[in-house]
């Protein structure tokens, strides 16, 4: 599909700004038009906005696991709270041990261990084996340990508060939010209500809620409880720990409501445990989320191909899976550096490949420039749903219409059939029943035929056949070459030597000289002969005149 020279764009913030400013100056045109391509078996399945991101923002969420009960209800909830506290300690102690072992690899006091750790990184760089990720991880680990130490200094005040969520800023180098899902429950059920509850009911409610939260903790930290390795926590796990209070931290870190749902679906928001204190039952988690640069004029268009009918058999179009369009420029997009959601594409770098003029012309609507590869596989897709309608190859599969009853036939030469609610309300394909609600308006091209010249060979079997034909042609050429060699072998090489050639040239020149001299001599003799003839004729005429004069006398 053309040359594979790539354009790579790194993601420093200044470069992101430059890209945004540059692309904002380009006139935005409409997205890739799939209407002329659908009948040729090329279906535009959707567009996504392209964004560049780098994981540069961090914040801390301090989960308060043990709630504070109102003074008048402490006695009622004492038993379930004590049991919950013991279970928490047993459950999260392995997690705390793993965090402690990780922190022992580097200290924040500038001591010997830190120097040894940083020296190991520098040594690795000198040996050429360290990566940017390793250095970034080391820096993040130092920062996490500093935040954990600062949080521990404030643990008593955090544990004593009755607020379900509040910002912690004293001595912290980054935004930190203390949340308490269980404290929120206690506040809603007991602190902020005038309803009087008996002690038995309080015990039951607190016990049930604590058990449910323990189940969530087990689900979130299950792998880390059974394994000493610390793994990242997903955004879903963070929401399980913090409840709806997680939005407060994300808002503080600058995540807008319009981005929140998309970022949650991308999985780019993660958390790493950095602290567990069994005395106050405080859990510290460092949250990492991306810094996103929106490329407003750039979109990714996804393409799918159907098996179409040609005079050479079934074939599929040779087009990229994903293309990107900025203004009038269309290039193939490499999505291996990207994470996709329903509406967005988040990429660490933008890598595009230029397309050949033929593919560019094809995607621009000139279906006669599209190239196809023969596909004879049984699993080749013969149909596809598009906006409530169906594009199907009714020569490859039976298109049975249930309402109104009938078989949809595909005309000879047509690549695919475009079926909408005007031609069939209920369609059955390979046992799958579809109720059609969309329509293909007049802007969709129909009755497109694929020429033989547009079908090329790419399959292994077809390539073997074509190679056989090429081998036959080569064999015929070799036979002709052998005949030519045999004729050349009959030529006396000595007659074609350099000395002989010089002799031939000299003799030829001499022959030409003699020929010219002979021609000159012949011309001279002819001229002399004609002169003699004129002299004789004159003498004869003169003698005749004298005789006539004598006779008259």
UniProtKB/Swiss-Prot annotation:
InterPro entries per UniProt: Fusion_F0_Paramyxovir (IPR000776)
Top-level taxon: Viruses
Keyword Cell membrane listed: no
Post-translational events: The inactive precursor F0 is glycosylated and proteolytically cleaved into F1 and F2 to be functionally active. The cleavage is mediated by cellular proteases during the transport and maturation of the polypeptide.
Presence of keyword Electron transport: no
UniProt-annotated stretches for the region Fusion peptide: 117-141
GO BP, sorted A to Z: fusion of virus membrane with host plasma membrane; symbiont entry into host cell
Positions marked as site (Cleavage): 116-117
Lipidation (S-palmitoyl cysteine): 523
S-S pairs: 76-199, 338-347, 362-370, 394-399, 401-424
UniProt topology in membrane: Single-pass type I membrane protein; Single-pass membrane protein
Record topological domains on the Cytoplasmic side: 522-553
SUPFAM superfamilies linked to this entry: Head and neck region of the ectodomain of NDV fusion glycoprotein (SSF69922), Virus ectodomain (SSF58069)
Pfam families: Fusion_gly
Assembly behavior: Homotrimer of disulfide-linked F1-F2.
Family note: Belongs to the paramyxoviruses fusion glycoprotein family.
Full protein name: Fusion glycoprotein F0
Gene that specifies this protein: F
């Amino acid at each position: 599909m053309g040359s594979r020279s790539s354009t790579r764009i790194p993601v420093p913030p200044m470069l992101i700004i430059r890209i945004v400013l540059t692309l904002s100056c380009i006139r935005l045109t409409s997205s890739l038009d799939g209407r002329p391509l659908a009948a040729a078996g090329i279906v535009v399945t959707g567009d996504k906005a392209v964004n560049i991101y780098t994981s540069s923002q961090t914040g801390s969420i301090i989960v308060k696991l043990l709630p504070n009960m109102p003074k008048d209800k402490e006695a009622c909830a004492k038993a379930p709270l004590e049991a919950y506290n013991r279970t928490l300690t047993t459950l999260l102690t392995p997690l705390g041990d793993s965090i402690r072992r990780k922190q022992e690899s580097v200290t924040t006091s500038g001591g010997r261990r830190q120097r040894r750790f940083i020296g190991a990184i520098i040594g690795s760089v000198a040996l050429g084996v360290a990566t940017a990720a390793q250095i970034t991880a080391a820096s993040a680990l130092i920062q996490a340990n500093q935040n954990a130490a600062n949080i521990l200094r404030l643990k008593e005040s955090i544990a004593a508060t009755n607020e379900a969520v509040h910002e912690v800023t004293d001595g912290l180098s980054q935004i930190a939010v203390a949340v308490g899902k269980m404290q929120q429950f206690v506040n809603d059920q007991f602190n902020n209500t005038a309803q009087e509850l008996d002690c038995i009911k309080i015990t039951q409610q607190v016990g049930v809620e604590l058990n449910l939260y323990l189940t969530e903790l087990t689900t979130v930290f299950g792998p880390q409880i059974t394994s000493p390795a610390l793994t990242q926590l997903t955004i879903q796990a963070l929401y399980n720990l913090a409840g709806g209070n997680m939005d407060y931290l994300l808002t503080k870190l600058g995540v807008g409501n319009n981005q929140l749902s998309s970022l949650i679906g991308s999985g780019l928001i993660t958390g790493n445990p950095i602290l567990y204190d069994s005395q106050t039952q405080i859990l510290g988690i460092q949250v990492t989320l991306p810094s996103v640069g929106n490329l407003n004029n750039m979109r990714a268009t996804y393409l799918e191909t159907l098996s179409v009918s040609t005079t050479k058999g079934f074939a599929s179009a040779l087009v990229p899976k994903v293309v990107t369009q900025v203004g009038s420029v269309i290039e193939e997009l490499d999505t291996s550096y990207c994470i996709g959601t329903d509406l967005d594409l988040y990429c660490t770098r933008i890598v595009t490949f230029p397309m050949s003029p033929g593919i560019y012309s094809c995607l621009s609507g000139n279906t006669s420039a599209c190239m196809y590869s023969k596909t004879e596989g049984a699993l080749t897709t013969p149909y596809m749903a598009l906006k409530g309608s169906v594009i199907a190859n009714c020569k490859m599969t039976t298109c049975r219409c249930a309402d109104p009853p009938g078989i949809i036939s595909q005309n000879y030469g047509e690549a695919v059939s475009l079926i909408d609610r005007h031609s069939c309300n209920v369609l059955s394909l390979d046992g799958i029943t579809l109720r059609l609600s969309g329509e293909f308006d007049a802007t969709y091209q129909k009755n497109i035929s694929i020429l033989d010249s547009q079908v090329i060979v790419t399959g292994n079997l077809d390539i073997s056949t074509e190679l056989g034909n090429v081998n036959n042609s080569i064999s015929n050429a070799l036979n002709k070459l052998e005949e030519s060699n045999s004729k050349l072998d009959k030529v006396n090489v000595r007659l074609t030597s350099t000395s002989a050639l010089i002799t031939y040239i000299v003799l030829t020149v001499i022959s030409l000289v003699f020929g010219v001299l002979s021609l000159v001599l012949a011309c001279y003799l002819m001229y002399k002969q004609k002169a003699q003839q004129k002299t004789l004729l004159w003498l004869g005429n003169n003698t005749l005149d004298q005789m006539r004069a004598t006779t008259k006398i």
